[in-house]
Amino acid sequence: FDEKNYHLLMKLYQENDRPGKVIETYYKLVNLLDKELGISPNKAIQQLYHEVMAKDRSDRKIKQFLRNTDHFFGRVGEIKRLESYFSKIIERQEPRALLLVGGTGIGKRTVTRQVLANQTKYFQIVMAECFKEEMTVGLQPWRSLLDGLGDLVIQHQILSTSQWQVILDSYFPMMAGEASDLELNTDRLARFVLDILQKISKKKALVILVEDCHWMDEASVAVLEQVMNHLRDYPVAFVLTKHLSTPPYLGHFFNRLLLRSQLDCIELQPLDFKTSAAYLQAQTGQLAISEERLAAIYRVSQGIPFFLSEYAEQLLRGEKFQPLTSVIKAKLSLKLGYLSSQEEELVDYLACFSSPASVALLAKLLGLSVEEVVEIA
């Protein structure tokens, strides 16, 4: 059997951006060779197949990630600043970080996706989301980032699939070791990531997106800082989203970037009344909402898009207005997982007030002294 013709056909499909036909042709060959000769396709064909699969995987991840919302209002100034940041990366061919800061439900993720959806022509995108539960697992965000980087490495023929897997296996099985081992691996990992980012960004500019970076473990921040310290003359955009709180080691990292003029910062503010009203009206369609109801919803939501969306759903279902819906409560519970039981109870009570509640009243509701409430707050 001459595999050359199959290889040429697969190459043609690859060049014409038809991944489905590449995969179909590959498996036809696999089945034929296995049935007739009991062998597998040659290494060149296998590598081409893995390249196409890696690109397809990467494209599907990005498409899923960048799904646009149908309800997007305001943030014109923030969007312009984000677009200016990405333009700067392309024009100067220099790495730079951007920090998008805001409270729960303020729209950090929505704004980021809205802008990145218009940048895919110029940038490749790799992302990771950080979780509080994984802060004790060393370098977990880098596992996610390397998963995406691996697809690009294979797609661009920088390394073969087997070579990439061998390198990954040399880092992550050892993460449960002693602190000294972790420190050594952090240094090695930073050098490896630096090399990979340089090679990938030579092909096309790159975005490294880290969501909820306030949950990044200290070792992951150390790797990120080492990479940014040594990355020069490559178009790599480091975009990080963060809650209002910041662990000290992450704060120190941002301060050092600021001193080197390598960090842009955008803090998202709640929507104003006019924009909030337009947002609600867009989500509820032709449903009539009185000025009084709009004012009440705005007072409780404080212009936070996530809350506005929940209250719009209530209106559409014709339900009685409830400031603390089950979805809002679940989101707050996940985002504020570090709260004690008393702090959670205080949040529940505060959510029921449309205006500030007195400390004395809260103390009475909680069955605590005024001093204890002040300490909790």
Language-model region placement:
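Key residue(s) within conserved catalytic/signature motifs
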Residues: 3-7, 16-19, 23-27, 57-377
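Conserved small-residue packing positions in alpha-helical repeats and bundles
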Residues: 10-12, 50
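Amphipathic alpha-helical segments of tetratricopeptide repeats
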Residues: 30-31
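Short coil/turn linkers that connect adjacent helices within long alpha-helical scaffolds
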Residues: 35-39
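Long amphipathic alpha-helical scaffold segments
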Residues: 47, 52-57
